[in-house]
């Protein structure tokens, strides 16, 4: 009898890129070319598990004490949260840039624990990480919230790209 070992597939999620990439309207020349929508994070976790066979999903997020209930909900859905302290920017908004944490986790801290990785971000800042993991045979997919906010640096990785807006009907919070 043939025995296939289960693969460990980890998801590394840029929460801010996911949130803004799905929820904000995008205009070009005064016309709305992308209508934002509310992503259901519980459905999204199931989507990652079912479609990509993700065994662990890391949600990288800036920590704001008032959002504790939301964080608890994310944990209950199955996400492992990785927090970054936030600072207040000049506009009075909390900012917690998590790019370095994603790179650290994916390329060092968790590298030997997973067979393949799925990334959720349209950010070109991860270009060198994707190249590194591609050479190691560990890059499975890059899920991009919408095609209008993805970095052109990701063009090289077209075979890995999945556009989340195409799954809106399945993943939208009603």
Question: What residues fall within each predicted segment?
Answer:
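Domain-level signal for Mg2+-assisted phosphodiester chemistry and nucleotide/NA-binding surfaces
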Residues: 1-94, 98, 135, 139
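Nuclease catalytic cores that cleave nucleic-acid phosphodiester bonds
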Residues: 65-174
